[in-house]
Amino acid sequence: MKKKQKKKGDKYDYFFYDFIKVTGALTALIWIRPKVYYPHGKPDTKGGFMISANHCSFIDPIVILCTFWWRRVFSLATKDLYSTKLRSFLFNSMRCIQVDKQNFSLDSFHEVTRRLKKGKVICIFPEGQLNLKSDDMLAFKSGAILMAHTANVPIVPVYLVPPKKWYNRRISVVGEPINVREICGFMPTADELNRAAEVVHQKENELKVFYHSIKNKNNANGQNESDVQQEVALK
């Protein structure tokens, strides 16, 4: 009997999340006009995994939701974003995980790994801050690596193209899943975790290079983006 009640509770836990996602979909599609490239083909996105992306705009979490529209994606949100009752309601409804950047607690760590182990999808921006001044990605922190390692889930690298204007179309490039345990072993040291973070950073830089190669090819050949996207999909 308790199990049935638990399942029913789980169902309604995501009611507002799904409501906001569905009702906001049209607005997001018109405003963001998302476009996604898969250099290596669309990755397997079943089960739990972590999304690692660069942080280049305030609406990056929304762009990620549009990129992985068929999954519920949960993001980390700093505690200062919960400054009003309305904000708290919104972020709690979207099932965000509240964190303190100055003092990342074990509770936040355990909540992230718990959801990953349950097959959920967590999005993390490992630069640790919003990077609006440079197209170059900042060094990645190893905390995301440790959480993915603890939950034994892959990391899917994503490069978000920084927009020049707020109304620009949002473009994302999705790479192949990365198994961090294959990089740093079963019982990693701090140095091995940092090395794994560098590998993820490198993979996202490769996605950035891929995007610019497509953009340059587009400009050189006078192709529109849909033609280029078709070529990418065939590879």
Give the ranges of each region predicted by the language model.
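Non-catalytic C-terminal accessory region of glycerolipid acyltransferases
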Residues: 2-12, 109-235
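Short hydrophobic helices that act as membrane-entry/anchoring signals
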Residues: 10-32, 88, 92-95
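Short, glycine/polar-rich helix-capping loops at beta-to-alpha or helix-loop-helix junctions
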Residues: 20, 82-87, 165-167
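Helix-to-loop junction immediately C-terminal to a conserved catalytic motif
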Residues: 24-55
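A generic structural signal for well-ordered alpha-helical segments
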Residues: 27, 68, 90-91, 115, ...
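Structural signal for hydrophobic
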Residues: 36, 90-91, 155, 174
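Structural motif corresponding to alpha-helix initiation and N-cap regions
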Residues: 36, 84, 106-109
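Catalytic core of membrane glycerolipid acyltransferases/transacylases, capturing the structured
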Residues: 43-103
